[in-house]
């Protein structure tokens, strides 16, 4: 698997004095069931045993073991929701 951290995400992490992120496929409950929701957070996960570790552009990226991708790669980026920037992961298959 190839993991990249784009320029926007690197700037976001530098602004928040972070050098690592972790990502997994979470879920959002709705009336119709659970909708898969890829998630990414700054920092390190509580249990490193559950994650594979990658380094991209000086950023440590922890990816939950068993994560499936659409094309063999994940990209950590930043999206803007209303006026707030937040980390996002692209390329997870679900």
Please give the residue ranges for each predicted region.
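Domain-level signature for proteins that mediate thiol-based redox and metal-cofactor handling
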Residues: 1-94
């Amino acid at each position: 698997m190839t993991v990249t951290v784009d320029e926007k995400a690197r700037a976001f992490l530098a602004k928040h004095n972070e050098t690592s992120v972790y990502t997994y496929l979470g879920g959002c409950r709705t009336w119709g069931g659970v909708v898969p929701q890829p998630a990414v957070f700054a920092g390190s996960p509580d249990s490193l045993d559950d994650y594979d570790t990658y380094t991209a552009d000086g950023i440590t990226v922890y990816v939950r073991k068993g994560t499936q991708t659409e094309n063999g790669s994940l990209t950590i980026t930043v999206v803007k929701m209303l006026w707030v920037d937040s980390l996002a992961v692209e390329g997870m298959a679900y």
